[in-house]
Amino acid sequence: FIGGIISFFKRLF
């Protein structure tokens, strides 16, 4: 779950 959140933020930034 955490990994998914990080990936989402990485896409935004």
From Swiss-Prot:
Exists as aggregates of 3-4 molecules. Has lytic and hemolytic activities. Its hemolytic activity is inhibited by phospholipids, but not by cholesterol. Has antibacterial activity with a broad spectrum against various species of bacteria including both Gram-positive and Gram-negative groups. Has ichthyotoxic activity. It is found in: Secreted. Expressed by the skin glands. It comes from Pogonoperca punctata (Clown grouper). Belongs to the grammistin family. Group 2 subfamily. One of its GO terms (cellular component) is extracellular region. Coiled coil: none annotated. This is Grammistin Pp 1. Its main location: secreted. GO terms for biological process: defense response to bacterium; killing of cells of another organism.
